[in-house]
């Protein structure tokens, strides 16, 4: 079970049989994940391509790709940094800090130097060459430093390719959709990878490091899980079907996010909250939250016209509805008797029907009752009454624990309605006369 609905053509590249990325690999920094291989190739000419989605916004730099002492990283200020041991570091001007979006990274190296692209835009050019063979049999890592986990990347990765012997442009790996203007992935199966090239798709649960280039240049993986449940790191959140996450840019108070921005720990005596990245104003939608530590936590939906808070979030008027074991908090009226209490380990289903303006909460697949709400645009949300709580969310990027109610969909881009205007820039271009 994936998107629980027919994908929107808008997110299928606007053309027939558009290529779909099946899986991503979640990189949860605290787990010390590792993805690497030892091998040789043409150190003077090669191309690396991959897609990434940010997780926690760390203040230390994060490794994207490294071999020996040369590396491509996200700096502590969110700029890209290409580091050459002999010639120093080179930085992008732009900063990459949107945890809700997928970025396409391409690094092309030839005898003239190194070029780094993001979403088909050049961001770093250097006469220095990224050296894959600084030492014999150099180890190359994706998203992990060679030694400690301190500088590991945190987030998601997909479609990892290395082309041995060619310096390619981003158009070899992705293209501009003619209807939407989006930069979207291509099918890489027809590329010539070179004898030491590789293509990682993360679709084989028995071998996450499997090379699909035909070269059998498999990667070693460590500290990733494919077990069913919240710890599964093989997910359906991809560049062709972006899923809702808890947004680290839309929070207040003491909130710590991890596991691809799907797990939240809320601490402290002050009111805290974090909001999901998808807002919906029509249709029927469903997500689940595992109550890891119930504490003082609430889960539910928040209407996005709430721009400020004066006191605890669940006390606001006309815009929020939360379920806390045995109680319902709605529109500023707290502590209404609702449903049964829940304990650590229970799974809370949160269904919102914006066609009829209703919300239903479930405890371990048992309906706790349907409640009316006001119309508006709602986002998933969790908050606290001043204490602590821990929840793990699932917006559909892995299989739900329980089948959603009939007609309810996961919060992902494939399920969103088609936009009214395609290629909006064509309607807002500046005209001179």
What are these regions (language model features)?
Residues 85-87, 136-157:
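Extracellular glycan-interaction patches encoded by glycine-rich segments
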Residues 3-29, 49-58, 71-132, 329-332, ...:
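Extracellular glycan-interaction surfaces
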Residues 29-46, 89-97, 146-149, 184-191, ...:
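Short surface loop/edge beta-strand patches of beta-sandwich-type extracellular domains
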Residues 29-81, 113, 166-171, 280-281, ...:
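Extracellular glycan-recognition modules
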Residues 298-347:
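Glycine-aromatic-enriched beta-strand/loop faces of beta-sandwich-type recognition domains
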Residues 1-44, 77-79, 85-86, 226-244, ...:
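Low-complexity, glycine/proline/serine-rich flexible segments
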Residues 48-56, 105-107, 157-162, 200-201, ...:
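Short hydrophobic/aromatic patches on beta-strands that form ligand-binding or substrate-lining surfaces
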Residues 2-23, 30, 123-127, 156-241, ...:
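Extended recognition patches within non-cytosolic domains
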